[in-house]
């Protein structure tokens, strides 16, 4: 990557949660730099964690001064979070046109999980203005950036031994109905929330052990999938909660003796947990996942459950994060402890599906033979282990601190320690 296609931010604390704002900033058409807004969260082993919104320096700050006098990013707003956030996400792009009952039209929402589901409101009511010269140098106010806690939803556990909600591991925000969020928990449950009314719609025991991640089927308000410590990927339909569909189970290890203490007929030997699940937004038949401590990424097809249709092998250490771009091209980014970000173009490997067959679990089965892919189309070597990544929406071309201009398109943000880098794809 060249200096013209990379931006960097050094946070005051180790970064864990990371997400790119998906809705246009006020004035974004006139000021492309304002679309660079990232939500980030800290990870420290105490009750003093924080979340923050960071953005690029505004063009109007840089009118008279040399671009290189300023860091790329600045903190726009921040708030205390207590325990670390296990996940942080901005509202979906569709939320800006959603009929909210308790939200200002000009504000944007963030959500975090940890000891509870928290919904935050980010506002930028007061435009940033440049004041007169002070001491021969232009100064600027901080603008009206505010990040305030809107709702805390701790929930109640279905598990008999729990009187209060157990810690939440992750969540998924529904794109079609942004008032819906589904959370996953270490107490084996998933809970569907209506954040507009601050109520739990339903809670179900989803797995035999901890649930680590959850994702809505794109385009659906009823179907979601989850992965967990029991090594399974399961699909649930809110219209029929009596049963779930097991789409994939990690292979049981060889030469492991069966459990000795009168196991139930459904007991399985210990298997490798699945940590993350992510749908391809361009074709929701396809999902990506990876095992705990695993260096391979499995690509699964809902039309062909049971085994991966693709396996991506190029990382040299455990994978920590993955994410699909929002374009029609199925571009997948993966990152891990080998200090690498790899981009995979899977267009030539995927079964083409028509619009009518998308989002259907009973579509015709494609050829289920697993393809092993070991040639990413792009690689970026970082200075340390990468713990998180986030794709941007489409962003217009803009002037960099060097004075050069970037092409329009997507950016990819990665987190490693206290550093965040934004890479032009």
Kindly label every feature range from the protein language model:
Residues 2-10, 60-89, 96, 121-172, ...:
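Inter-blade linker and blade-boundary elements of WD-repeat/beta-propeller domains
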Residues 7-50, 84-87:
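Beta-strand-rich domains and repeat architectures in extracellular enzymes and scaffolds
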Residues 20-26, 31-35, 89-106, 171-178, ...:
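Loop/turn segments within WD40 beta-propeller blades
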Residues 41-44, 112-115, 183-187, 227-230, ...:
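Conserved strand-to-loop turn within each blade of WD40 beta-propeller repeats
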Residues 50, 116-119, 188-191, 232-234, ...:
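A conserved positional marker within WD40/Gbeta-like beta-propeller blades
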Residues 51-59:
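Beta-propeller blade signature
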Residues 398-425:
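Blade-level signature of beta-propeller repeat domains, shared across WD40, Kelch, NHL, RCC1
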């Amino acid at each position: 990557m060249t200096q013209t296609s990379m931006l960097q931010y050094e946070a005051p604390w180790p970064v864990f949660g990371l997400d790119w704002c998906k809705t246009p900033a006020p004035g974004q058409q006139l000021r492309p730099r304002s679309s660079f807004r990232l939500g980030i969260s800290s990870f420290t082993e105490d009750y003093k964690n924080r979340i923050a919104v960071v953005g690029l320096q505004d063009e109007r700050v840089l009118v008279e001064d040399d671009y290189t006098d300023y860091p790329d990013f600045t903190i726009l707003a921040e708030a205390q979070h207590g325990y670390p956030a296990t996940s942080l996400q901005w509202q979906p792009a569709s939320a800006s046109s959603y009929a909210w009952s308790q939200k200002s039209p000009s504000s944007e929402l963030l959500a975090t999980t940890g000891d509870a589901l928290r919904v935050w409101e980010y506002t930028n009511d007061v435009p940033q203005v440049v004041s007169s010269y002070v001491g021969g140098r232009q100064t600027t106010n901080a603008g009206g950036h505010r990040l305030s806690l809107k709702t805390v939803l701790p929930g109640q556990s279905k598990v008999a031994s729990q009187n209060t909600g157990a810690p939440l591991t992750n969540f998924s925000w529904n794109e079609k109905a942004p008032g819906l969020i589904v959370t996953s928990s270490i107490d084996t449950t998933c809970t569907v929330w209506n954040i507009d009314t601050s109520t739990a719609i339903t809670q179900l025991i989803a797995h035999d052990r901890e649930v680590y991640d959850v994702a809505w089927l794109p385009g659906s308000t009823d179907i979601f999938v989850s992965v967990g410590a029991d090594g399974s990927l399961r699909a649930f339909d809110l219209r029929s909660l009596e049963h779930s569909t097991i789409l994939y189970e990690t292979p049981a290890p060889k030469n492991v003796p069966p459990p000795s203490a009168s196991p139930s007929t459904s007991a399985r030997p210990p298997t490798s947990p699945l940590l993350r699940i992510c749908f391809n937004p361009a074709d929701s038949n396809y999902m990506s996942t990876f095992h705990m401590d695993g260096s391979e990424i499995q690509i699964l097809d809902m039309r062909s459950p049971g085994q991966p249709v693709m396996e991506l092998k190029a990382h040299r250490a455990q994978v920590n994060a993955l994410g699909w771009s929002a374009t029609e091209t199925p571009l997948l980014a993966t990152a891990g402890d080998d200090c690498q970000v790899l981009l995979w173009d899977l267009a030539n490997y995927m079964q083409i599906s028509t619009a009518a067959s998308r989002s259907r679990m009973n579509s015709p089965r494609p050829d289920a033979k697993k393809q092993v892919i070991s040639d990413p189309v792009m690689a970026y070597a970082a200075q340390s282990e990468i713990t998180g990544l986030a794709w941007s929406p489409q962003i217009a071309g803009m002037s960099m601190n060097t004075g050069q201009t970037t092409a329009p398109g997507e950016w990819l943000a990665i987190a490693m320690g206290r550093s965040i880098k934004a890479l032009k794809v």
